[in-house]
Amino acid sequence: FSATMPPEIHRLTTQFLHNPVRIEASAPSSTAASIEQYLVKVPHDAAPKRDALRALLRTQTKVKNGIVFANRKTTVALLEKSLRKHGFSAGALHGDMDQSARLKMLAAFRNNEVTYLIASDVAARGLDIPEVSHVFNFDVPIHAEDYVHRVGRTGRAGREGHAFTMVTREEAKYLRAI
């Protein structure tokens, strides 16, 4: 059983299982109507893209807390360092962290000790992070379902949410799938 099945896993099931059966309980996921979604065109180069993120964060005056998603763990670490260097309250969460470090960071985020959680997709699924006011996709997710799960961190229980996706010309192909 899997609540969601990425395309790679689906390909593996058809390759190794005999007569696999797929059961879908609902249509493909979509985002909540209470989430305002925005696209922000940004340069491809890393440093100007980080500059654009910091500028975007500064324009958002009503951020209670926010999750900044990146596609790579190395980008997560770089963004955390960059944001902290420029005076933002930020912490990292990714799959290479041990469980105690992840739990400590989640507690700090939930208790508003950290305003921005910089995360890989490990934080998009299955974690209980209530009342996230903003989501920022530093990278466009490669799979459309990941976009739904990332954006779904905000706008929960009918609350208003805000989601910003930074997109470079090179990432447009992923945006079309969303």
What are these regions, as identified by a protein language model?
Residues 1-178:
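Conserved helicase RecA-like core
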